[in-house]
Amino acid sequence: MLCADFLNTLYKLKINRTFIEHIKNSSIKKSNKCTYINMEVEKKIDPLGFREYDARWLYPKSINSKGIEAVGKGFGTQVISSEKNPIVIVGNDYRSYSEEVKNNFIKGLLSTGCNVKDIGLCLSPTVYFSQF
């Protein structure tokens, strides 16, 4: 959420008017100190990230957090349609953004009714073999 006073600063700095109008047209919430404007982040997913046997993107350049959540929701929808009460195992690597990506993916999975087991920091083969 952005404070409406911040919008005035943007106007003074002659920031992109289209961006400002988009912000102004978002839903508005009042508080004691100032007016807040809710800015929803649009999901971004580069379709070229989907490969034959996996998916790979540069985060956040090719996919953002809402996009990751949507991929989790799509995956969860596929899993839940073929199995009753599925358990999906997830893990993450050492990269600085991996935890954020994993959490958004889990959010998408949970929204479909999948059960999730998070095994934390691990190698890819660990996730694969953890299903047995």
Please name every model-derived segment:
Residues 121-132:
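Conserved phosphate-binding catalytic cores of ATP/NTP-utilizing and phosphoryl-transfer enzymes
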Residues 6-7:
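Short hydrophobic targeting helices and cationic amphipathic motifs
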Residues 111-120:
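A glycine-rich helix N-cap at a beta->alpha junction
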